[in-house]
Amino acid sequence: MISVMQQMINNDSPEDSKESITSVQQTPFFWPSAAAAIPSIQGESRSERESETGSSPQLAPSSTGMVMPGTAGMYGFGPSRMPTANEFGMMMNPVYTDFYQNPLASTGWYSYGQPYQFTANYSIPSLDGNLSDITIPTTAGSSAATTPNAAMHLPWAISHDGKKKRQPYKKDQISRLEYEYSVNQYLTNKRRSELSAQLMLDEKQVKVWFQNRRMKDKKLRQRHSGPFPHGAPVTPCIERLIN
């Protein structure tokens, strides 16, 4: 290209310049294609791979056809002996390989002593003894303290003998209470104390009797009145029947 330009400069005639220009236009320019560069790259990588394989030691494949470079000379098995499950897990785990390859790793472990042992004098109390030896503290008001075999009672088997029993009213007491109820359904504190003294009852018993009597009357009124205590509602059908 430079020679063509020099000829153009040296030529004085326009015809020579035209011929040189046409010759320059007709000469094609070619760049190296990617297809031509690929074989050279493949050849270089192949030569590098061959040089690496030639410098590295060759490992004999195992019976299964697998070659493990990290396990050569580290475990006691070879083509004639298959690794166990624990050994295979140690091979595949990089933590174990780093530990065994490092000679100072085993010196960093602390050796612990035997686990704690129970003392020889310690004994568990047995429950095979007689239950009569077990004593349960009781209060002064409980009935278990008065019984001869109070020590045999257990917390879940304490009797309820100390509970006050219900005392029924006598006929003369009921008749007098009914008379007082017919006169007045609610007693004052003074009248309640007088009535309890006359009937030889506690004021609480008189109060409870009047409460139960009022509840009984309420239930009787509800039973007689039905679901409509203020009377049945008047419907158009009932109005026609009345008229």
UniProtKB/Swiss-Prot annotation:
Coiled coil: none annotated. The keyword Transport does not apply. InterPro entries: HD, HD_metazoa, Homeobox_CS, Homeodomain-like_sf, HXA10/ABDB-like. Residues 162-221 bind DNA. Pfam families: Homeodomain. One of its GO terms (biological process) is anterior/posterior pattern specification. Residues 1-12 have a biased composition (Polar residues). One of its GO terms (cellular component) is nucleus. Keywords: DNA-binding, Homeobox, Nucleus, Transcription, Transcription regulation. Residues 1-23, 40-67 are annotated as: Disordered. GO terms for molecular function: DNA-binding transcription factor activity, RNA polymerase II-specific; sequence-specific DNA binding. Gene3D superfamilies: Homeodomain-like. Disruption phenotype: RNAi-mediated knockdown applied to adults causes posterior morphological abnormalities in their F1 progeny. Knockdown by feeding of dsRNA to stage L1 larvae causes defects in tail tip morphogenesis and reduces expression of dmd-3; both of these phenotypes are exacerbated on a php-3 mutant background. Knockdown represses expression of microRNA mir-57 in the AB cell sublineages. It is found in: Nucleus. The keyword Ribonucleoprotein does not apply. Interacts with nuclear receptor nhr-25. Interacts with geminin homolog gmn-1. Interacts with homeodomain protein ceh-20. Transcription factor, involved in posterior embryonic patterning, morphogenetic movements of the posterior hypodermis, and cell fate specification. Binds to the 5'-TAGT-3' motif in regulatory elements of genes, including Meis protein psa-3 and microRNA mir-57. Involved in a negative regulatory loop with mir-57 to specify posterior cell identities. Required for asymmetric division of the T hypodermal cell, acting via the regulation of asymmetric expression of psa-3 in cooperation with ceh-20 and the Wnt-MAPK pathway. Belongs to the abd-b homeobox family. This is Homeobox protein nob-1. It comes from Caenorhabditis elegans.
